[in-house]
Amino acid sequence: MTTLPETKACKVNIENEWLTISFNQPEKRNALTSELTDDIKNIFDAARDDLGVRGVTMRGEGGIFCAGGDLKMFKTGFQGGEQGMKDVEEASALTGAFFDMINSYPKPVVMLAEGAAMAGGLGMLCAGDIVVVTEDCKFALTETTHGCLLYTSDAADEEDSVDLGGRRII
């Protein structure tokens, strides 16, 4: 069996040939921080060819699946004027590639959600092969309130924001 990598933002467990990844940043509402996405990518890479792992379950700790993107990074990086449109497009493309990695994984990926799956958290949830949610789980696509178009490599410019009726743009 492959040795799984050390993680910063996840708990990892293998039991009965099944890998469980638990997002373990409830104080950040299990946001898609760079630490969390790096952990998930590294775990998926390590388990990809491991015959001792037949499938993967992903879930959130602390009563929430995932609140989406890391808004602290978003506000300082993208809305702080330090990065341009190209940087926003690259970040969006990386997010899309992350979802594609989950969706195209060669083993079944089961998503278990409770609490909320918001923005990129909902995108990640939809990338799974099987999705199970609690009856009271909340869902929302809130990217447009931050000037981003949904799961594309684009961000809204001034002209687009007028078309979308937006008030804030990147």
What do these predicted ranges mean?
Residues 1-61:
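Conserved CoA-thioester-binding segment of acyl-CoA-metabolizing enzymes
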Residues 163-170:
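Hydrophobic alpha-helical segments, chiefly the membrane-spanning helices
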Residues 96-147:
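Glycine-rich beta-to-alpha active-site loop
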Residues 58, 70, 124-126:
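Hydrophobic/aromatic residues within transmembrane alpha-helices
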Residues 151-160:
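Conserved small/polar residues in nucleotide/adenosyl-binding loops
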Residues 16-17, 63, 137, 167:
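Beta-strand-connecting loop/turn residues
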Residues 60-98, 117:
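Glycine- (often His-adjacent) and acidic-residue-rich active-site loop
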Residues 35-39, 94, 101:
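Charged catalytic carboxylate motif
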